[in-house]
């Protein structure tokens, strides 16, 4: 049986990367929420 997690750096960056987050209003909300919470890593 094939495992469900087949890692790809490109796919990860395009969907969860910093620039992907900054591209939309909701993504910016995510970044701001993580900044406010004091997260060390804001995005993948």
From Swiss-Prot:
The keyword Ribosomal protein applies. One of its GO terms (biological process) is translation. Pfam families: Ribosomal_L34 (PF00468). One of its GO terms (cellular component) is ribosome. GO terms for molecular function: structural constituent of ribosome. Keywords: Ribonucleoprotein, Ribosomal protein. Gene3D superfamilies: 1.10.287.3980. Signal peptide: none annotated. InterPro entries: Ribosomal_bL34, Ribosomal_bL34_CS. It comes from the Bacteria. PROSITE patterns: RIBOSOMAL_L34. Belongs to the bacterial ribosomal protein bL34 family. This is Large ribosomal subunit protein bL34. The gene is rpmH.
């Amino acid at each position: 049986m094939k495992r469900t997690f087949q890692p790809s750096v490109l796919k990860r960056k395009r969907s969860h990367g910093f620039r992907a987050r900054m591209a939309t209003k909701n993504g910016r909300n995510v970044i701001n929420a993580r900044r406010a919470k004091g997260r060390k890593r804001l995005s993948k």
